[in-house]
C-alpha cells in the first residue's frame, strides 16, 4: 500500500538511509536495483558464482536456499538468484525448510559463502575495497503522483550480512594500508560525481 509505505518512510529516524536519491552520497544500497555495480554485486541475487566446500554455486541466493532446505536440492547450485528465490520460497511454503535465517549456524554458513564470493571475484573485491560509504539494504519502487513510494525491509533482520561485508572491507583496507597499496585504489566516492543522479518521473 503506497500511503502505508510512505508513512513508514516519513516516520523513519534516518531517512537518508532509505532514500535512493542519496545513494552514493550517504550509503550504498545492497540491492539488485542499486545505482552501482557494487550494490548489485553484493546482493544475494547477483549471478556471481563461487566455490565453497568443493562445490560451485551460481548465486549466493542458491546457496542460501540449498542450506535452508537441508542441502537436499542440488538444483539450487545452478540456479540464478531470482530462480533460486522463486523455487526456494515455494519449497519453504511446502514445509521443506529445516532451518531459518535467525539460526546462528545458518548465518555462519552464509557468512562463509559471502567471504568466498567476494574473495573469488577480484572485481567485486576491488570495488568493495575502494568504497567507504555504509552498506544499507532496502527496497523501493516508484509511487503515484510523481512521488517515490518505499517498501522498507527490516534491516535489523539481515544486518548481519552487511556487517560481514563491512568487516571484510575494513580488514582488506587495513591490510592494504599496511603494505602501502591502498593508494592504487582511489575511493569509489571520488567517481560518483561523474554519475548522473536518477530522475523519477
Annotate the PLM regions.
Residues 1-199:
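Charged, low-complexity intrinsically disordered segments
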Amino acid at each position: 500500500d503506497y500511503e502505508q509505505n510512505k508513512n513508514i518512510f516519513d516516520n523513519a529516524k534516518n531517512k537518508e538511509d532509505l532514500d535512493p536519491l542519496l545513494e552514493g552520497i550517504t550509503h550504498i544500497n545492497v540491492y539488485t536495483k542499486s545505482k552501482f555495480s557494487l550494490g548489485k554485486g553484493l546482493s544475494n541475487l547477483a549471478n556471481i558464482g563461487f566455490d565453497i566446500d568443493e562445490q560451485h554455486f551460481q548465486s549466493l541466493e542458491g546457496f542460501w536456499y540449498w542450506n535452508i532446505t537441508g542441502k537436499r536440492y542440488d538444483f539450487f547450485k545452478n540456479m540464478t538468484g531470482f530462480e533460486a528465490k522463486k523455487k526456494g520460497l515455494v519449497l519453504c511454503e511446502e514445509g521443506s525448510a529445516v532451518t531459518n535465517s535467525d539460526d546462528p549456524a545458518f548465518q555462519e554458513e552464509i557468512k562463509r559463502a559471502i567471504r568466498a564470493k567476494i574473495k573469488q571475484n577480484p572485481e567485486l573485491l576491488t570495488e568493495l575495497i575502494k568504497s567507504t560509504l555504509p552498506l544499507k539494504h532496502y527496497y523501493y519502487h516508484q509511487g503515484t503522483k510523481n512521488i517515490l513510494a518505499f517498501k522498507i525491509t527490516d534491516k535489523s533482520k539481515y544486518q548481519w550480512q552487511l556487517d560481514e561485508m563491512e568487516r571484510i572491507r575494513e580488514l582488506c583496507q587495513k591490510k592494504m594500508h599496511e603494505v602501502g597499496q591502498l593508494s592504487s585504489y582511489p575511493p569509489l566516492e571520488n567517481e560518483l560525481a561523474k554519475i548522473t543522479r536518477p530522475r523519477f518521473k
